[in-house]
Amino acid sequence: MSQVKYGTSVAYRHMCRWFSGLFVMHPLLSGYEFYWRVEPGVDFYCKINYDVFQWMEDNNKSYGFVISLLELPKTVTSLWPITREYLKQRRITNSTLLNFFLNDYGNYNLCHFWSNFEIARFSIWRDPAYLDYFTYLDRWDGFYLERWGDAPVHSLWVGIRLNKSQVHFFHDIGYRHDTISRCVNDGSRCKCPKSAINFDFHKDSCLARWLEYK
C-alpha cells in the first residue's frame, strides 16, 4: 500500500471510517435534514446564486455530486464481495441504480461519487438499514486493512437504496479538490483558471457513464 496515496496513513483511515458512518451520530448535527461537505483548501469556480438545500428539497433529490471517478483498485479489494454477501444475508433487493457501479460481470467497476463534495440528506445515513450495513462493514476492518474510502462506501449504498432520479449532478458548479477540477462554461457566473484541466471526460472519470445511464 505504500505506492497508493495515503496508503500508509492511519489518520486518513480514521477520517474515511468517520465519514462513512460515525459523523451522522454527532449531536450537533441532529437537528439538520441536509448537509454539504466542504473541505479545506478546495476552490469553487462559480458563483452559487441559489439555495442548494432548498433546490434538493423542491426537486425530491437525496444525494448530489460534482465529480465521479474511478477508485484505486488496491484500496477496495474486498469491499464489493463483502457488500454482496451482506445483501444476500439481509435479502435486500437492489435498486436499478446499483448497476451503474457494476460491470457486465456483476463486479464493482470502481466508479464512485467523490465525497469531498457531497450534498445529501442525513436520512440516507441515519436509516437503520445503512447503520446496519456500516456496522457489518466495520467488523471486517477494511477501512484499516485495505483503506476503504467513505466515497465508495457511500456510493454503493446510494446505488442500493436510491433511484437515479433522486441523485443530482451539479453541472452548474465548478470545483477543484487536490489536482482534480471541473469547469463550467458560463462566463457570466464562472471563472476557471487557465491551468485547470476539466476532469469531466478524463479517462478516469465516470461522468460519461452517468450521463448515459438510464
Please provide the spans of the model-predicted regions.
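Catalytic core and acceptor-binding pocket of nucleotide-sugar-dependent glycosyltransferases
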Residues: 42-193
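Beta-strand elements of modular eukaryotic interaction domains
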Residues: 25-26, 34, 107-109
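Active-site-proximal specificity loops/subdomain of glycosyltransferases
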Residues: 1-31
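Short beta-strand-to-loop acidic/aromatic patch adjacent to the donor-nucleotide binding site
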Residues: 30-45
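Surface-exposed beta-strand-to-loop junctions
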Residues: 2, 32-33, 131-134
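Short, hydrophobic/aromatic alpha-helical segments in well-folded domains
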Residues: 19-23, 38-39, 51-52
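C-terminal helix/juxtamembrane-tail motif
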Residues: 194-214
